[in-house]
Design a protein with these regions (language model features):
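A short, charged helix-loop
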Residues: 221-248
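Short Gly/Pro-enriched turn/cap motifs at secondary-structure boundaries
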Residues: 100, 142-145, 169-172, 186-188, ...
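Short Ser/Thr-interspersed hydrophobic loop/turn segments at strand-loop and sheet-helix junctions
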Residues: 57, 86-91, 183, 199-204, ...
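A gly/ser-rich beta-alpha-beta helix-loop segment of oxidoreductase catalytic cores
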Residues: 133-155
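A short core secondary-structure module
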Residues: 164-206
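Flexible, small-/acidic-enriched active-site or ligand-binding loops
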Residues: 149, 202-231
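N-terminal glycine-rich flavin-associated loop
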Residues: 95-118, 144-147
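Alpha-helical interface subdomain recognition
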Residues: 1-92, 114-117, 126, 130, ...
Length: 404
């Protein structure tokens, strides 16, 4: 953010990308280099990032264009490679800017996938312009990785849905204008008894005031629903189709989480290279030591490994959109795409953690100084290994697929 560091662009020449993606990456990097946002107050900063990203039309990559551009998107469909490029570039400069962008996409993704034309027209253009802040409310205190165990209830009577329960670890909690919320509509059916709803922030009975402080500050809150009454048009997608919709939404954005991790890792490497070339010790620079060169080489390889898996996962999804075939072929393709996204998310986030830790070690004491870029990256990367599917969940997805 406002940094003299610039992200590399040579990877944009890889065959995963086309001219649109290459232009996007270069334009966004130039724009981000000029931005200065005070991030000392994470809620205020996120609102500011959403405003800027919306005003400058970057949020248009969070939603599809719709007929004649009516939904406000930049491209005809949600493009996974564009999402990866945007998140990688934003995260290189500011993980909080990346968070602000990502939650607009995740929070509105289910509306893109399953919303009625009226729901899409009501919400998606305002998400794309930054006029409304979106949130995705799935997790609960006892239902994180085991999302199917959620206990929030939705009961139906006389054409009205009544929501009771709570959600926690909700990104954009307390600042969002609406929450795509998942609730049990038939507990006896387990995961097949979950339905999604769109709940506006000003709905009576919704309390989002319980903020959660974490090691890398960003807006998180617990939501409490006390007899929240919703009209029938608040239901999102099919009755009892909520769990499938939640998983489809997460699948779309999983590769982009990996992209964000790659961006943070690239920034850590840039910081380490710059510092090692300047730091003098024992009559030479830190970069002159073979041990430093070995560490830098390992960091670069770790980044590329994660990046290539990430770009492959995004490309596979985009190709499936372009070449839709038979239902049988699509089922096989879905499995392949899910595994590819899991590999990308697992590898990119775990490798980014290693790269940032190695970069911090090269900085010595300066690496743990509060306020330094490496110190903040060290805090920022940790949660990325957990949210939208922890590393262990990705390992299970991959392992089960290999054993089939």
């Amino acid at each position: 953010m406002g940094s003299t560091r610039t992200p590399p662009t040579t990877h944009l020449a890889l065959p995963f990308f086309d001219a649109v993606h290459r232009d996007l990456g270069k334009r966004l990097a130039a724009w981000m280099a000029a931005q200065q946002v005070d991030e000392s107050d994470d809620r205020k900063a996120c609102r500011e990032w959403v405003r800027r990203l919306g005003d400058s039309q970057w949020l248009r990559y969070c939603v599809p264009a719709g007929d004649q551009g009516a939904l406000g998107g930049a491209l005809a469909t949600l493009d996974s490679r564009a999402l990866v490029i945007v998140r990688e570039t934003l995260a290189f400069y500011s993980p909080l800017a990346d968070f602000s962008f990502a939650m607009q996409g995740l929070g509105s993704g289910a509306i893109t996938l399953a919303g009625t034309p009226a729901q899409q027209a009501t919400y998606l253009p305002l998400v794309a312009s930054g006029k409304k802040i979106a949130a995705f409310a799935l997790s609960e205190a006892d239902a994180g990785s085991d999302a199917g165990a959620l206990q929030t209830r939705a009961t139906h009577s006389g054409g009205i849905w009544t929501i009771n329960g709570s959600k926690t670890w909700i990104s954009n909690g307390g600042i969002a204008d609406f929450y795509v919320t998942f609730a049990k509509t038939d507990p006896a059916l387990g995961v097949r008894g979950i339905t999604a709803f769109i709940i506006d922030a000003d709905t009576e009975g919704l309390d989002s005031s319980e903020h959660i402080a974490v090691m890398a500050p960003h807006p998180l809150a617990t939501l409490r629903f006390s007899d929240c009454r919703l009209t029938a048009d608040r239901q999102l997608g099919a009755l009892h189709g909520g769990f499938k919709l939640a998983m489809q939404t997460l699948d779309i954005f999983r590769a982009s989480v990996a992209g964000a991790a790659v961006g943070m890792a690239r920034r850590a490497l840039a910081e380490a290279v710059s510092f090692s070339k300047q730091r003098q010790m024992f009559g030479q620079t830190l970069a002159d030591f073979q041990l430093t060169q070995a560490k830098i080489g390992e960091m670069a390889a770790l980044i590329d490994a994660g990046a290539l898996l990430t770009y492959r996962a995004a490309w596979l999804r985009d190709e499936s959109q372009r070449t839709q075939s038979s239902e049988h072929d699509d089922a096989l393709g879905r499995s392949e795409r899910t595994v590819a996204a899991a590999m990308a998310k697992m590898t990119a986030t775990e490798n980014a953690q290693r790269v940032i830790d190695m970069a911090l070690q090269l900085h010595g004491g300066m690496g743990v100084k509060v306020g330094s870029k490496i110190e903040s990256l060290y805090r920022d990367i940790r949660s990325v290994r957990i949210y939208e599917g922890a590393t262990e969940v990705q390992q299970l997805i991959i392992g089960k697929a290999v054993l089939r």
